[in-house]
Amino acid sequence: MRTANEYEIAIFKKEYCKNGEVRISIGKDFEVDVESFEELLPGKIVSSYATGNRDIENSFIMFRVCDVIKDIQYFPVFSETVGRKMLKSWNKPVPKKRSIFIEDNNGVGRGNGGTGNGNKNNVENSKLRSLILFARSLMILHINDPQPMNGMLKEIYEKLELHPYWNVRNYEVKAVNTAIGSFLRKDINVQNENFQNLQDYILYLQTNVTGRRLRNTNFDTLRNIMRTEYPAEQVYF
């Protein structure tokens, strides 16, 4: 199934995103799932599919909308408030919010899409998920129209989240490291802050984001896991 082009997205916005009533009809006319529910950096803004490309702050919900007849998929983005209303109307649950920040109560027991990871997860499993979330945050730092998470990162993240006791493999850490390195060489990074590695980005966050607690940023054990099999690999985190 191919992803919609700009023209098809414009038509989709016009026909299905102009108000609450037509947004609800998305669930009737297409197959719909939540692609991601993500918290943004303080002050970070992304564009909504809602009429007028309204700015979204704080967090967004991205859907995967499949037109099975035309074999086209869309990834509309809405504010958390709008997205929650859509999910409620379709009787669909709100998934966990992905965030590089730690809430005071960690979202445990809220039952409404909190960020809690449970009580006794595999430590490296949790750290690799955190690493992926920091990588994702970096990759959309200067993006106004976010696209789905990098396919390999998404696959690994969802596996780790589904199986919190899964023992992290060295090739999984290497795949995340490779994705980070690939992004760092892209123009969108080079022409802005030009971070040389993920630690540069974490330092940027520690300097520029106040009043929020970051997830654990000590990834030493993950580096060691990767180096046991790939000692010559350049580390980007």
Q: Where are the regions a protein language model picked out?
A:
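Extended, alpha-helix-rich binding/interface surfaces that flank or overlap catalytic cores
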Residues: 1-237
